[in-house]
Amino acid sequence: WQGPDRRISRFLLWAVDTRELGQQRALLGMLASLAEGEQCAVYAHALLEHEAAAPTGSERRLVTWSHLFDWVAHYIEAFQRHTVAVMPPEEMLLLRGFLGVLATVVRYSPATRDALFSHKAYAPLERLFALYACAVPMDLKAALLRAMAAFATQTGTGASPRILSALWDNLDQSGAIRSVRGEPPRALYELEHIECVHGRYPGTHA
C-alpha cells in the first residue's frame, strides 16, 4: 500500500486513474482483495479519500468515495424520476465491484466504518437503502445488502449501537421486511415474483 516514503504507492495512484472499462473492473476486484485485514482496510480508505486534482477538461477519478456516493445518488434520482429507467450493464458491474470494495473496507476497519457512517456528505446507509428500494437488478440489490450488512460487523466490544439503530430504522422504512401501505414486504415480493421466476436467489442469499 505504501512506498518507501510511506505515502500511497505510486502504482496504486496510477492504477486508480485507469479509464478502460475492463481495467476498472479488475482494479476494483484487486482493491477488494488488498483491503482484507484491518490495517489494509485503513490504507484502502485513505486511497479512496484521496482526491487528486484532475486536469481541466478530464474526467474525475473513478475510484473515490465521493464518486461512489455521487454515483449512487445519481441512480436514486434516475430511478425515482423514471420508473422505466435502466442502468447500463457495464455500469452495474462497476457499481457492484465498488460496493464490494466498500463492504470489505467497512467490514475490516471499525475506524473506517465509523468515519464513513458519520460522513454527512456521503450519507452511506441512507443512499444504499434508497437505491435498494429502487427497481434495480437483483444482483445489484444483493451487493447493496452485503455492503449495508458490513456496517453491522461485530468487532471488539461489538457493533456500534448508533450504526445498528440507523440500519434497523432504514431497513424498517424501506419496506423490505414489513408491509407498507398494505403491500407485501419487498423482500418477500422479490423472492416470489423475481428470484423464483428466474431460478436465481442473489438477494435472498445476501
Regions found by a protein language model. Give the residues of each.
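Extended alpha-helical scaffold regions
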Residues: 1-206
